[in-house]
Amino acid sequence: MQISAIREAIAEAARAVVLPDSLPKLTCSGYVPDSIVAPHFFVAEYEQDFDKAMGRSLDELMFTTRVLVGRADDRSAQQLLDSMLSGSGPASLKEVIEIARGGPGEYALGGLAHDLHVMRVQGYRWYEHAGATYVGAELTIKVIGEGSS
């Protein structure tokens, strides 16, 4: 699998989140940014398991992604974060990212992987990034695909 392309494709899928009109659009990046414009989603660390099937036919990637929200008002920031962490709805990161799975019989992420699954939310807390404090959380995304490509 082409990890750099997968990172960018996950970020591109997250851009489809629809936030309320009064809020800025979600910004997204495939890598940990030096600085952010909140709210911001980015692909951070990953773990890779090779050879989940014979002949390099399947590798598994576990991406840790983060979403950070500005804290102008702690309650409204957490409500916005909650909406992005929900399992469904126009602001749901899970829902918009899993649309990139493609239809039945299609490869995920525009052909970059066999499948993906947003598995869990963790680490709901205050984060410091580039000297500023944000409320945020991590989403774990499993991606499986051809090991030899």
Cite the ranges covered by each PLM segment.
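Charged, amphipathic alpha-helical segments and their flanking helix caps
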Residues: 1-34, 45-149
